[in-house]
């Protein structure tokens, strides 16, 4: 009698060939989750102003230090009054984008109030994403992203919140991810430092501050791109999405004063 359990109840190998036992065995190595991001997007920056919120991100996907993919859109509109900006791993960003599309589809399916009383608010979308990020972190398989959710609530309040790969969340009148948290945020805080500064700031002033911060990031961040997208969510005019913008009016004269630049001697 053949005592091999893989042989019970099946013809002999001479009839149908040897049985592949690998499908019933564990892998030779333990399962390994993503250890570090591969193709990444850099900073997302945002700020509140008197009637809404403004958010911007460039369109570059970097393969390590290689500026590999152009035209990567990292601002994702969700509904009519929310934009989600994502930095970090591009493949994880695409997964989050699919989750958001499924969320919109599920909310709209057989729901005549999907564009009215039961429309997706920015706060709903943020709570969903914060839960997803914390759940993946708790499984020791995080989505390697930092996310900013910007929008205007149905009552007219500005909404701007941040969540990262650990599920850490916070809010501020100005928010930035990545290198922008070090380089852009101080510039934006010169315009809007506290909640009390928001009613004094017009959309023109806010947009000028964002564009200037994108220029500084292009100067200083080796993973940034000249091309960027900008979205304005206004409680009066709704969502305005500007694509294919470029950093303009650059002045590189300051480079000669940077130690280590070019052929100068230190």
Swiss-Prot record:
Gene3D superfamilies the UniProt entry points to: Glutamine Phosphoribosylpyrophosphate, subunit 1, domain 1 (3.60.20.10)
Subcellular location(s) of the protein: Cytoplasm; Nucleus
Keyword Transcription regulation annotated: no
InterPro entries with a match to the protein in the record: Ntn_hydrolases_N, Proteasome_beta4, Proteasome_bsu_CS, Proteasome_sua/b, Proteasome_suB-type
Claim: Magnesium is one of the keywords in the record: no
PROSITE patterns documented for this protein: PROTEASOME_BETA_1, PROTEASOME_BETA_2
Gene Ontology, cellular component aspect: cytosol; nucleus; proteasome complex; proteasome core complex, beta-subunit complex; proteasome storage granule
Propeptide, residue positions: 1-33
GO biological process, one term: proteasomal ubiquitin-independent protein catabolic process
Annotated keywords: Cytoplasm, Nucleus, Proteasome
Domain of life: Eukaryota
Subunit structure: The 26S proteasome consists of a 20S proteasome core and two 19S regulatory subunits. The 20S proteasome core is composed of 28 subunits that are arranged in four stacked rings, resulting in a barrel-shaped structure. The two end rings are each formed by seven alpha subunits, and the two central rings are each formed by seven beta subunits. The catalytic chamber with the active sites is on the inside of the barrel. Interacts with CIC1.
Note from the entry: Present with 16900 molecules/cell in log phase SD medium.
Similarity comment: family membership: Belongs to the peptidase T1B family.
Protein purpose: Non-catalytic component of the proteasome which degrades poly-ubiquitinated proteins in the cytoplasm and in the nucleus. It is essential for the regulated turnover of proteins and for the removal of misfolded proteins. The proteasome is a multicatalytic proteinase complex that is characterized by its ability to cleave peptides with Arg, Phe, Tyr, Leu, and Glu adjacent to the leaving group at neutral or slightly basic pH. It has an ATP-dependent proteolytic activity. PRE3 and PRE4 are necessary for the peptidyl-glutamyl-peptide-hydrolyzing activity.
Name the record gives this protein: Proteasome subunit beta type-7
Gene: PRE4
């Amino acid at each position: 009698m053949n005592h091999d359990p893989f042989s019970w109840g099946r013809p002999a190998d001479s009839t149908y060939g040897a049985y592949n036992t690998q499908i019933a065995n564990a892998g030779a190595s333990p399962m390994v989750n993503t250890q570090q991001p591969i193709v990444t997007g850099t900073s997302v920056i945002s700020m509140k102003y008197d009637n809404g919120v403004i958010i911007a991100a460039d369109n570059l996907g970097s393969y390590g230090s290689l500026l590999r993919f152009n035209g990567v859109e990292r601002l994702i509109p969700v509904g009519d009054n929310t934009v989600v900006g994502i930095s970090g791993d591009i493949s994880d960003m695409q997964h989050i984008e699919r989750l958001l599309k499924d969320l919109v589809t599920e909310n709209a399916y057989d729901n005549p109030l999907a564009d009215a009383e039961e429309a997706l608010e920015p706060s709903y979308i943020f709570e969903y994403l914060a839960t997803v990020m914390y759940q993946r972190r708790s499984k020791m398989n995080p989505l390697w992203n930092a996310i900013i959710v910007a929008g205007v609530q149905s009552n007219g309040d500005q909404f701007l919140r941040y969540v990262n790969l650990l599920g850490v969340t916070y809010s501020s009148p100005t928010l930035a991810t990545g290198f922008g948290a070090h380089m852009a945020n101080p510039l934006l805080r010169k315009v809007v430092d506290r909640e009390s500064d928001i009613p004094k700031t017009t959309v023109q002033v806010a947009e000028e501050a964002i564009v200037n911060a994108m220029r500084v990031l292009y100067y200083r961040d080796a993973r940034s791109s000249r091309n960027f997208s900008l979205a304005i969510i206004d409680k009066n005019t709704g969502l305005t999405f500007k694509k294919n913008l470029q950093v303009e009016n650059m002045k590189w004269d300051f480079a000669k004063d940077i130690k280590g630049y070019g052929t100068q001697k230190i």
